[in-house]
Amino acid sequence: MTTEIQLELEQAVNQRRNFAIISHPDAGKTTLTEKLLLYGGAIHQAGAVKARRDQRKATSDWMEMEKQRGISITSTVLQFDYKNIQINLLDTPGHQDFSEDTYRTLAAADNAVMLIDAAKGLEPQTRKLFEVCKLRALPIFTFVNKLDRPGREPLELLDEIEQELGLQIYAVNWPIGIGDRFKGVYDRRSKAIHLFERRAHGSQEAQETVIQLGDPKIEEYLEQDLYYQLKEDLEILEEIGADLDLEKVHSGQMTPIFFGSAMTNFGVKLFLEAFLDYALKPIGRNSSVGLVDPSYPEFSGFVFKLQANMDPKHRDRVAFVRVCTGKFEKDMTVNHARTGKTVRLSRPQKLFAQDRASIEEAYPGDVIGLNNPGVFAIGDTIYNGKKLEYEGIPCFSPELFSYLKNPNPSKFKQFQKGIQELTEEGAIQIMFSTDDFIRDPILAAVGQLQFEVVQFRMLSEYGVETRLEPLSYSLARWVAGGWKAIEEAGRIFNTMTVKDGWGRPVLLFKNEWNLQQVKEDHPKLELTSIAPVGSGIQPS
């Protein structure tokens, strides 16, 4: 029996790939996501990137505010099949104010796709998210986008990635021309040239002509200067580049690089097929009992995201669970590591942005949606068999703080419910004054847009108009020794002492100088910019 289960698990794991896309805003993430869905048959026509009135809304941007602004501000899950491989694409927020949501999503991913604008190269948000991938040793696949527009020289971009990120590089394909003269790519795997036909906004799969580099007919398709430039570039690549080493790719030391244009579909299919060959299958994860392999027959998984009101008609709450080991089955009863209780997992769902369908089973690498009536927290482990807990997902230091006020006392219950649910799902961090007379919660954010989203959702989902009252602090540090350490430190000048959502002490500082002064005055006070995890074991 055990052997049968393990064979079933092994087959399921071999047929799955799981990844998240990281990029700076406006690098074309939503467009690339939709083109991958187009090739996977999950959608039949790509949605409009800018959500113009006469075109479709982008498939992965489902929240009302996202549709209004044309930006992604939450992470979603998009599942599709391509050539008998099930792909779980963990779509991440496109706005830099929501990098913490992206971090949580990366905790559930086995691979990352780094999307770069060919004209701009590496940008600040991409660098930040790369550091998170590096910490987790995630394999990183690079897609250089927007080759159909004027951009930097490809060799210059390779050099920047290698020098600034410290990655070894391997160009899997190479662009032929840039901007208006972008004709297609040379695929180093098949040693063939793929020339693309331009279609309106790339709403259908790209049509292409495939010819060998030495084909005498090449002059019919390619201008002479582009042909000679390609040959020269390929010679340089052979001289300067290392061979593709999948061990180095899988450990995050080498990045395979692809060139193309998501808007026009140039190079997207070549990227997808190579990615499926090179990417890691679902992998083992660190836990309280060591590294747990996906083939372990007992079910386990962890919650990496909560989302309230995904369906406005039902006012539901969904927990996103990454399946880590074993086979998930509908209506199974599992252990909830944080509370020690047992939970029946009824009504599991397969997620596709705002669309959902009931599922009967799921395997390692899959993401399922579970109905969450206040049971789960981010980082929670659920399991069967021997007790285990996966690494939790920490919160990072916010930089903006503001009281959130409810001017209408008759909306008190709705206000409390909204704050609780939005905090649980990680839309924003919440803190409270240690002064019992101050009841207003303190919102703590990475960027201003998080405040706007909370106010928007409080009104649209809970019917509560709110008012912000900013605080003049810009840094938060958690106190390692808890309230006892605060007591022993005595009076701490020029700070505000608050408690976070788990009741732990946090010090707020006006600036870096203020923080350094407190460190000098209280050398025994251990401060950290990353919160201890509320659920799960502390990441190593």
Curated annotation (Swiss-Prot):
GO BP, sorted A to Z: regulation of translational termination
PROSITE patterns in the record: G_TR_1, G_TR_2
Residues annotated as domain tr-type G: 14-283
Chief localisation class: cytoplasm
Compartments, as annotated in UniProt: Cytoplasm
Keyword Transferase: no
Keywords noted in UniProt: Cytoplasm, GTP-binding, Nucleotide-binding, Protein biosynthesis
Domain of life the protein comes from: Bacteria
GO molecular function (one): translation release factor activity, codon specific
CDD domains: RF3, RF3_II
Binding site for GTP: 23-30, 91-95, 145-148
Cellular component aspect of the GO annotation: cytosol
Protein family per UniProt: Belongs to the TRAFAC class translation factor GTPase superfamily. Classic translation factor GTPase family. PrfC subfamily.
Known role: Increases the formation of ribosomal termination complexes and stimulates activities of RF-1 and RF-2. It binds guanine nucleotides and has strong preference for UGA stop codons. It may interact directly with the ribosome. The stimulation of RF-1 and RF-2 is significantly reduced by GTP and GDP, but not by GMP.
Protein name stated in the entry: Peptide chain release factor 3
Gene name of the record: prfC
